[in-house]
C-alpha cells in the first residue's frame, strides 16, 4: 500500500516514558476529519484549539496537526476497499494522542464499525464520557445542573466483540448444535432460524476498567464509583463484572466492606475523603440518572450498558451534539466526536461542532495543558450569549442562529 500520510516537518512526537506522557511544546497530533458532517465540525475544532493554545501560552506552545485517513476519505485516498489503513493505525499508535470526527460504518462484510475496530485494534479499553450541563443549554429535565458524571465504559469486550452468526448460516447451526448437544442448552427456541451472539467478559478486562474508574475518582476527588450491571440475569458475565469490580477495590485499593457488603468504601489517599464503591442494576440505573442524578459521579460499566447510559445522560444535558468522549488505553488515547455522521447535513455548515470541540478540551487536559480550559469558558460564553447552532436555537428564546463555523468563532470570541 502506498503511503499517503504527510508528516509535518516541524514538531515532535508525544512519547510515553516511565508510565507517563511526555508532551513537547510543539506536539504532532494526528486527526481524522471524519465522514459526513466531519467536514463541517473538524475545521472549527482545529481553529478553536489553535486559538485556545495561543491565548493560553502565547507562542511558547503550538500543536502541529497531522491528518490521517479513515472511512470514506480513506477509500478515496487509497482504494475502495481500504476503510481503515494500516498506515493510519500505526500513526495513531506511534504518536500516542489523536482526535477524530465521526466515521461511517462500511456496507457489507468485514468490520462492523470503524469506531469499534479502532478501539479494539489499539486496545483502547476505556471509553470515557464526561456528562455535565452548560448553563443555558436547553434540556428536557427540570434540574440538568444535577447531572455531573463521568462514565467509564468497557470498550473491547461484551457483545461489541462482534462474535455473532447470522440466522440459518452453517456457523449459527454449528454453534446451536454444540450448545444443545455438548452443553445441554435446552432453552433455544426456533433453532433453524436463530441468530447467535457471544458475550465475552473477562476478569482482566473488567478489572482494568474498574481500576481506571477508581483511580479517576481518587485523582478528581469524587464521592463514589458505581458498578452498573445486569448481573441479576447474566450472572456469569454481568454479575462477574460486578464481583470482580468489588474484588479489585478491596485487594488493590484497600476498600472495606460497608455493613457486611457488597458495598465498600476507601479513603482517598490525597484528600482523606471517603469514596463509596457501590452497584446498581442497569435498568434501575436508567431510572436513577433521571430521578436522582446527584447521587452518582463516576460510573463503571460494560460496553452495551455504557452505550445506553452515555446517550441517555447526554440527552439530559443537551444531546450528543455536545457530548465529548475519549478512548483510552495504557499508552494511546483517541478522542472523538460521539455523534454520528448525519450525512443529510454534511457540507451545509449547519450542525453543532460542540462534541468534537469538547473532546479536544479533554485531549488538552490529558496532555497536561490545563490552561487550555479556555475552551470551556468560550463554549459557556457562546451558549449564554445565545449565539448558537440550529439544534439549540430552535429551543431557546431570543437566540441568534449561527452556522457551524461561526459557532466556533463565537467560542473563540468568548475565551
UniProtKB/Swiss-Prot annotation:
Which InterPro entries does the entry mention? IsoCit/isopropylmalate_DH_CS, Isocitrate_DH_NADP_dimer_prok, IsoPropMal-DH-like_dom
Q: Which reaction does it catalyse?
A: D-threo-isocitrate + NADP(+) = 2-oxoglutarate + CO2 + NADPH
Q: Where does NADP(+) bind?
A: 104, 339-345, 352, 390, 394
Gene induction:
Expression increases when acetate is the sole source of carbon and energy.
Q: Does the keyword Metal-binding apply?
A: yes
Q: Which residues bind Mg(2+)?
A: 307
Q: How is the cofactor bound?
A: Binds 1 Mg(2+) or Mn(2+) ion per subunit.
UniProt-annotated binding residues for D-threo-isocitrate? 113, 115, 119, 129, 153
Q: Please provide the record's keywords in A-Z order.
A: Glyoxylate bypass, Magnesium, Manganese, Metal-binding, NADP, Oxidoreductase, Tricarboxylic acid cycle
Q: Could you say which EC number(s) this protein's record lists?
A: 1.1.1.42
Query: Which terms does the record give in the GO molecular function aspect?
Result: isocitrate dehydrogenase (NADP+) activity; magnesium ion binding; NAD binding
Q: Which domain of life is it from?
A: Bacteria
Q: Which GO terms describe its biological process?
A: glyoxylate cycle; tricarboxylic acid cycle
Could you say which cofactors this protein requires? Mg(2+); Mn(2+)
| Positions marked as site (Critical for catalysis) | 160, 230
Quaternary state and interactors = Homodimer.
Entry's family note: Belongs to the isocitrate and isopropylmalate dehydrogenases family.
**What's this protein's function?**
Catalyzes the oxidative decarboxylation of isocitrate to 2-oxoglutarate and carbon dioxide with the concomitant reduction of NADP(+).
PANTHER family xref list:
ISOCITRATE DEHYDROGENASE [NADP] (PTHR43504:SF1)
NCBIfam families in alphabetical order:
PRK07006.1, prok_nadp_idh
Q: How is this protein named in the record?
A: Isocitrate dehydrogenase [NADP] 1
Q: Which organism is it from?
A: Colwellia maris
